[in-house]
Every structure is written in C-alpha cells, then in structure tokens.
C-alpha cells in the first residue's frame, strides 16, 4: 500500500534586486584606491597614485535614465566598468551611448572646441563588463 511520494526540493533561491547589486558594485569601486587596484589587475600595471583617477560616472538624473556603473580617466584612458548579472547582447550599444555621453561631458569640462581646425586629443576608450549571472556566457 505504498503511495508514490514525490520528493520535494528544499533548495532555496535568494534573489537580490538588480539595483542593489549595481549599488554594491558602485559602492565598492567608488573608493579610488580600490578602483586603482582593479585597474592595475586588469591592465597588468602597477600604478600607485590613486589621485590620478578622475571619475566620469554618468548620473541618471542628468542624462534621463542613462546610468553606468563606474567610469574614470587615468593616464589618457577613459575606462567604463559595467557589472551585469543578466545576459544583455546590447551591451556594446549601451557602451557606445555611455561613451558618447562621457566624451560630451569631457569636452564641455575641458572647454574643447570640436568645431575648430585643431585635431582634439581625447582619452582612449576601454570598456569592461563584469558578468556574474547564472546563464552561461559564450566567448
């Protein structure tokens, strides 16, 4: 008289809201010394003057919904670091938009004349995406 008992899975899933994960990433790397360590690890450099970092993170209040995680200039490179917990094949497009906004801000802050006859020197762009989602990511 044995009834088939279905085994129940007692696996619990903890979901953290995306905005909190983004906020954590931003909070951790908002400290210049920690960000410099990450930059050095990614670029195989050994810079130690965190004051060389100039933050250029887009604020969504200014740019109507556009927000990036961490962006900064160091030694002639405009770095954009994005944290993603879900796959998004449109990250290159978003990166292009973010860089456009950042260059616009850089040009204004440095009073550069994009209509002049002199070729402007702008920071070189570097885009890094940190992905820690559960879906497999193809190379």
Located regions from the model:
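Accessory alpha/beta interaction modules
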Residues: 2-139
């Amino acid at each position: 008289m044995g009834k088939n008992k279905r085994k129940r899975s007692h696996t619990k899933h903890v979901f953290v809201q995306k905005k909190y994960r983004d906020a954590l990433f931003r909070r951790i790397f908002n400290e210049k010394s920690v960000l410099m360590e990450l930059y050095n690890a990614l670029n195989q450099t050994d810079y130690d003057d965190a004051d060389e970092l100039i933050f250029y993170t887009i604020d969504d209040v200014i740019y109507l919904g556009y927000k990036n995680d961490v962006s900064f200039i160091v030694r002639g490179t405009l770095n954009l670091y994005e944290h993603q917990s879900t796959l998004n094949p449109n990250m290159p497009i978003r990166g292009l938009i973010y860089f456009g906004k950042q260059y616009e801000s850089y040009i204004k802050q440095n009073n550069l004349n994009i209509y002049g006859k002199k070729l402007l020197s702008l920071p070189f762009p570097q885009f890094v995406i940190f992905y820690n989602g559960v879906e497999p990511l193809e190379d």
